[in-house]
């Protein structure tokens, strides 16, 4: 299917870091300053210009180093405004981020929605919307990077804004699938589709390959439109799966409890271990303590003294293993991802003779791992985005390894199915988005019940809906 471009054209961002606002290469005085003396501008026009430059600086710096590493000093120097001017306009950097995000998300949602409603059928509407988004991403890659990744690590208000934007897009697609937004709260299809599209887009934006998205719009549309408009019987609402976004459930484990589960494994006291075993134990305790603290307080609340105290090691021992708290975080992230991939691979390989059964076993094992290791799951799938670009690179490498188990699906696909080349990558993104959803909303205890539906959504583009549904029902029956 060839994507038809929408009739609308993406509007140029008034406050994006475009060439007409810059001079020279990236540097300390990148954005133009107002002329000194009489310039004929009203106070309102001056403030509008200053706000625009600060938003542009925030967009650029987040794309470069991530939100936690952005300082107000960096913002004022890059935007060419004074600190007093900054604080006259914004209370803090979070308020500036929210302002930039609202501008980008509002324009993006409006542009994509306009393209979507111009289609004559669901398949065409979705593809037109993807083309519209790809055009914006190519025109404003740094702004789109902020929209997809920049809110992580910025606090609950930023995540709340992001969730509202995601829900608006989900509702648009859900309505286009000729379904009531509230009629089937257990259907994860729309979240899965949004996750796949977001993953493909975010990866290319972060890697400086935004121009590829326009060419991929048709493939993503074909992938998304391969899913039937209704879930097969026996999957919708089965095993008590819920996809709602109404916050933590009454039985969800709070952050402190997630941390204590990890902390409870930490040994202490005298021992007769060899030096190598001691070092291994210390490293494991530091990793587990890091995951426990981040589960409770987030990356921003992570401190070396608390890591050392909970891990029952000295500060000197900590520094022998990790130079900074960021390195400890990356160490914990690698351990969590390695464990998740290991249990997935072992389950997959045990049933590899029948690829679809191996995938089902792997997804079931992955969801079981997430449920049993809530602190590590939260760190690797949620907190990673707000830590640093290095953490996101580690995540992308792990996701690429996970995608490798899906690629044989192209070979196993029936002759009548021609899955687009982007399918494996998009499906992997969809799986991780659903995991992210359950973890973020403190619903990990329900995730194992979602495994059959995840299996169906994973297999459908490769095997078709019949075998995908049969495999998913078999998994659901085995858990009864």
Predicted regions and their residues:
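Long compositionally biased, domain-poor regions of proteins
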Residues: 56, 64, 134, 138, ...
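Amphipathic alpha-helical packing segments from all-alpha helical-bundle domains
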Residues: 155-180, 186-194, 198-199, 215-222, ...
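Hydrophobic alpha-helical connector segments
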Residues: 113-142, 345-375
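Helix-turn-helix
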Residues: 61-95, 99, 293-327
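Amphipathic alpha-helical segments used for helix-helix packing
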Residues: 137-156, 170-174, 202, 371-389, ...
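Short, amphipathic alpha-helix enriched in basic
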Residues: 47-74, 270-275, 279-306, 342
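Short, basic, alpha-helical segments at the C-terminal edge of helix-turn-helix-like DNA-binding modules
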Residues: 101-109, 303-304, 332-341
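C-terminal peripheral helix-coil segments that are non-catalytic and often amphipathic
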Residues: 1-38, 171, 175, 203-276, ...
């Amino acid at each position: 299917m060839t994507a038809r471009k929408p009739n609308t054209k993406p509007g140029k961002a008034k406050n994006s870091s475009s060439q007409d606002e810059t001079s020279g290469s990236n540097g300390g005085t990148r954005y133009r300053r107002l002329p000194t003396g009489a310039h004929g501008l009203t106070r309102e026009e001056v403030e509008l210009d200053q706000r625009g430059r600060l938003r542009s600086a925030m967009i650029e710096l987040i794309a470069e180093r991530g939100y936690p590493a952005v300082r107000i000093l960096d913002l004022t120097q890059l935007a060419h405004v004074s600190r007093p001017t900054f604080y006259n306009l914004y209370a803090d950097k979070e308020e500036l981020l929210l302002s930039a995000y609202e501008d980008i998300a509002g324009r993006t949602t409006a542009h994509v929605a306009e393209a979507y409603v111009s289609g004559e059928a669901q398949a065409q509407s979705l593809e037109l919307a993807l083309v519209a988004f790809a055009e914006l991403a190519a025109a404003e890659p740094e702004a789109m990077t902020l929209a997809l990744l920049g809110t992580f690590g910025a606090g609950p208000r930023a995540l709340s804004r992001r969730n509202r934007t995601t829900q608006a897009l989900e509702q648009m697609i859900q309505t286009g699938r000729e379904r009531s937004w509230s009629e089937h709260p257990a259907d994860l299809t729309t979240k899965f589709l949004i996750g796949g599209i977001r993953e493909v887009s975010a990866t290319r934006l972060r890697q400086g390959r935004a121009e590829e998205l326009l060419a991929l719009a048709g493939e993503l549309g074909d992938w998304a439109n391969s899913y039937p408009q209704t879930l097969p019987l026996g999957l919708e609402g089965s095993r008590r799966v819920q996809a709602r976004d109404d916050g933590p459930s009454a039985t969800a484990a709070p952050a402190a409890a997630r941390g204590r589960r990890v902390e409870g494994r930490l040994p202490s006291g005298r021992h007769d271990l060899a030096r190598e075993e001691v070092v291994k134990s210390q490293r494991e305790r530091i990793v587990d303590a890091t995951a426990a603290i981040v589960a409770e307080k987030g990356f921003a609340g992570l401190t070396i003294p608390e890591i050392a105290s909970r891990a029952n090691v000295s500060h000197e021992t900590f520094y022998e293993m990790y130079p900074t708290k960021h390195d400890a975080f990356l160490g914990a992230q690698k351990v969590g991802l390695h464990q998740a991939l290991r249990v997935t691979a072992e389950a997959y390989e045990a049933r590899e003779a029948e690829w679809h059964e191996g995938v089902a076993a792997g997804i079931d094992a992955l969801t079981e791992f997430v449920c049993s290791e809530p602190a590590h799951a939260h760190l690797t799938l949620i907190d990673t985005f707000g830590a640093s670009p290095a953490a996101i690179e580690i995540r992308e490498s792990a996701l690429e390894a996970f995608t490798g188990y899906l690629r044989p699906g192209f070979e196993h696909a029936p002759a009548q199915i021609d899955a687009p080349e982007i399918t494996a990558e998009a499906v992997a993104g969809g799986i991780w988005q659903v995991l992210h959803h359950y973890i973020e909303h403190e619903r990990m205890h329900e995730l194992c019940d979602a495994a059959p539906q995840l299996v169906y959504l994973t297999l459908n583009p490769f095997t078709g809906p019949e075998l995908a549904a049969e495999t998913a029902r078999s998994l659901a029956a085995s858990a009864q």
